A protein has these predicted regions:
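GIY-YIG nuclease catalytic motif and its immediate N-terminal context
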Residues: 1-30, 34-35
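Activation targets extended, charge/polar-rich intrinsically disordered C-terminal tails
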Residues: 8, 98-159
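Solvent-exposed, well-ordered amphipathic alpha-helical segments
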Residues: 16-19, 48, 113-118
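Short amphipathic alpha-helical segments, especially helix-boundary/capping motifs
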Residues: 17-20, 51-53, 85-90
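Aromatic/basic micro-patches that form nucleic-acid/chromatin recognition or nuclease catalytic surfaces
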Residues: 63, 68-111
Length: 159
């Protein structure tokens, strides 16, 4: 045992989570959304599952789940990055056994943070989430993808 860790913890480093994309965009369908920073009025995420990606888009009246196929995270990020959107590329965080109870409104930010296992107690808006993930205090690295330089066509899987 070294420095309070068990030997098996040192021999087996923690596994990385599935690849993930986090998309920030400007939606102003609601008067409340117009009060948020332009370009950061809504967010949704995609999580890789084999050759497919599960899109989780938390909307006002429902959570929309869609399955898409893409060759890799970079190609999918380029497809999603268009004017008015910012795409972050990263990975799903480790699931923690014990979580503090969250008494917060169930917004797009809260849904995305739960899907991606992001712990950020004071984050309530899409822009705050963006800053948190790119800030130095974030536990893992996320990177920005710029506007699409190439067009990639995604085939929808299933019905």
């Amino acid at each position: 045992m070294a420095h309070g860790r068990r030997d098996d913890e040192e021999a087996c480093p923690p596994t990385r989570g599935p690849r993930a994309l986090l998309v920030f965009e400007d939606r102003a369908e609601s008067i409340l959304l117009r009060r948020l920073r332009p370009g950061f009025r809504h967010c949704f995420c995609l999580v890789q599952s084999g050759a497919n990606w599960i899109v989780c888009d938390p909307l006002k009246t429902r959570v929309e789940l869609t399955l898409v196929t893409a060759p890799n995270a970079g190609c999918l990020a380029l497809q999603l990055a268009r004017p008015g959107r910012i795409v972050l590329v990263g990975e799903v965080g480790p699931a923690t056994a014990r979580r503090r109870p969250r008494l917060r409104p169930f917004t797009c930010v809260e849904a995305v943070m739960r899907v991606l296992c992001i712990e950020a107690g004071l984050v309530l808006t899409p822009y705050q989430l963006f800053r948190h993930l790119l800030g130095s205090a974030a536990p893992r690295r996320w990177s920005i993808t710029g506007e699409a330089g190439a067009e990639i066509h995604l085939d929808r899987v299933g019905n």
